Amino acid sequence: MKVVYVGRDSKRHKALVAQHLDVIVLLHDNWDDFTYKTTFPTECRIKGSDVEIGGIQILIENEKTTFAYLDKLVADGWDGVFPIPGSQYVSVPASLSFYEQIDGHLGLDAAIEVARTLRDASFLAKIEDDGDALRLLATEGFRKSLQRERGAIKAYLDGWKLFGRKTISIGNQIFRFRKPGEDISTIELRFASASPLPHDINVMIGPNGVGKSQLLHQIVANWLKLDPDIPADTGFNGRPNLNQVVVISYSPFELFPVDTSQDKNRKDHDVYRYFGFRGRMKSLTESKRGSDKITLSREFPKTNAARSLLACLSDDQKYGAIKEWSKKLETMERVLKSAFPFDRAAVVIDGDADVDSFFATQEWMTEPYLEGPAWDEDGPNLQVRYVPIASDRVDELKVLVLGKHLQDRLGVVFLKDGKPLHLSSGQRLFSYIVINILGAIRRNSLILIDEPELFLHPTLEIAFIRMLKSILASYGSKALVATHSLVAVREIPRDCVHVFEQTDQGLAIKTPPFET
């Protein structure tokens, strides 16, 4: 597979895409990582079709601005085809999906060939023990630029496992944290297990004020740090091989960050996702310009779920060729049908929109959409269309068009026998949480859940833990739950239960002496 740098040369870019069935084209980007400019967006064609693989960062020895160095080579006669002549360099993709997509479409040999061509840091350091690569890995440029974003860190830590066909999983994690006015405490999250019992979920239990939610907030703050050289006495012990942190918290009093949109120094904003009753909403300021103000609203679970269901569809379309991909819509249907019966989940679309524009084809579809009134507890009935988002029609639906006409404030509607299904408030919130997690989750994510008993009654709380186990297993991910409830603890092995207790000597974290 050919890899070619074109930079700003749009004419050559178009010609390469038109001429080659299998090609990766590297484009120009001026993104600055602590004075290093190493980032390249890509366009990838495989077997004549567009495939989304994400960007890549390339560090050249003794150079801070990679595109300027490559532009000079092109001016001196280089045709832009990799490998770069007469240069020592290493690269790291923005995420593991870069090579997973190539593997899924063309096979592992093709992915390894591209890794050699781009001198992938993980492949060269951990499989080939390449001395030139190891020297570059010890530089400031690699540490501050190629290992700045969490997706790139994960790609470096675990990329070699993909090339060696080894299982990529999250191991035990040690985290140091501090309660105000107290010494540092340490918790070991036991995610790796030699026993047959799954260790995908760890639970913290203890009274209010003992430090459980404080720990979750400190995990988020540490995860969102960008500069690896900032000294800290708290945080993860080493760089965790995580892809993403997702927070689920439906307390009206919590103050987790709702997103990272205000962080202009961050390129990958999906590395952290939050779902709860808080979010950004446009409001008019004194100057009459719209500003994104963080507000509290029970609309957010509904709007997030509608958007997340389309995200599940989009991910299944983009990443379906990856060998280890667990299809999100199939997972959603399997998990939720164990909680209540339904035929399909649907989104609500404008009643006056051109319905044909939502579909690539309707030829093989039964009931591509339904029409009827939308029951909205907060407003008048509207005449709308329900478009099922289901695993049997992934390739027939157009995500971008659906997104433009989406009535997201009406949430996700479940259809049974051709009619909207009425759910209790608990069932609705349960379904929204499942869909939100699936819409956001990447492989090897850490899900943080704060006090699920606040928003789920005991029967649904048990179903929630079992649902969580199923999703985590499908995506190689883990969860940490803070709770007061013994219901959740009963579903978890004893060595994954952390009992928080305030003593005269400070905070004590213990494991139950017997299976819970």
Name each model-derived stretch.
Residues 1-167:
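Long, basic/Gly/Ser/Thr-rich N-terminal segments
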Residues 128-195, 280-425, 435-442:
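Extended helical coiled-coil dimerization/tether regions that scaffold
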Residues 245, 313-314, 502-506:
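Short acidic (Asp/Glu) and glycine-rich catalytic loops that position anionic groups and cofactors
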Residues 177-236, 403-516:
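Switch/communication elements of ASCE P-loop NTPase nucleotide-binding domains
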Residues 60-123, 128, 226-308:
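ABC ATPase nucleotide-binding domain signature region
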Residues 170-172, 242, 476:
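A broad structural signal for short, well-ordered beta-strand segments within beta-sheet-rich domains
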Residues 223-227, 252-253, 340-344, 472:
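A generic secondary-structure signal for well-formed alpha-helical elements
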Residues 246-249, 344-350, 448, 480-481, ...:
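A structural signal for short, well-ordered beta-strand segments and their strand-loop junctions
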